Amino acid sequence: VKWLSSAQLAVSTGTSGNSEIPNYYHLALVSGGANYDDTAGFYPSQSGNEELGWESTWANNFALRLGFLDRINFSFEAYYKRTSNMLMRVPESYTVTGEGYRWKNVGVMANKGIELSADGDVIRTRDFTWNVSANVSYNQNRLKELYNGVTEYVNSTTGLKYVVGHSVSEFFLNRYAGVNPANGEQLWYDKNGNVTNEFRESDKVMTGKTYDAPWMGGFGTSFRWKGLQLSAQFSWIGTRYVINNDRYFEESGVTFGTAYNQSNRLLYDRWKQPGDITDIPRWGEVTQLDDRFLENASFLR
């Protein structure tokens, strides 16, 4: 076939391991310095886990690459990865182990995605070539299992909640409903979607927004004339979200007991009198970390 200049098909499968946790966590350890009644002593500092092992990832890849007319190239790639026996700090009972957490092999996580790319010479002569290229990929992460039959686990330090069936990078937050125009109080949605002026941990929900961008790609073009070349390359990320901690502190008001380094929005845009329509509450309200500070971090550069 004259118009088909090249064709490649690649399929691969295999497993790999990961042991990236602190050293010696499989050992039960004791430490000194536990003095009592002027007598030197030891105390159990780590319970250990003799069954601790490597987590395992099974990866499958498929790739199809085609070339047309010696000037257009197209590729399609797909992958599926399943990680089992994940290394995770699992909550433990102090009365049983003397520790709040313990490293264990638990849980299953799956990742899958596709990538499309193409490039071609729009113009190609002896002295001049104009080439364009583009690629786009979509990646999905899902937690399949946790530990001991648990289906959800809150990571209190990151604003994330690990829930079976969801992405491990999905934010778990209260939903901000704005400011009450009558009195300047902050408002939130409860779990049922009703507006309330009470901030409750029990009203947090999975936002559907993740800090890992599912969509990403790039495009570019290049011009070559004899020995000179000019090129431009762009990359983009779509639907990625981050918590704007700077904004949280700058709009905190009296939350942290200080008014240093505050945003001028607190002065100019805050609620001042009944009837004001704004998203900045009255002075004296304690700012809560909710989804008002969850911002779209998509970019093109």
Regions found by a protein language model. Name each.
Residues 1-163, 226, 295-301:
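Extracellular/periplasmic, surface-exposed regions of secreted and cell-surface proteins
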Residues 35-40, 88-91, 113, 192-200, ...:
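Active-site-adjacent bridging/hinge elements
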Residues 93-101, 153, 158-159, 173, ...:
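Surface-exposed, low-complexity loop segments enriched in small/polar and acidic residues
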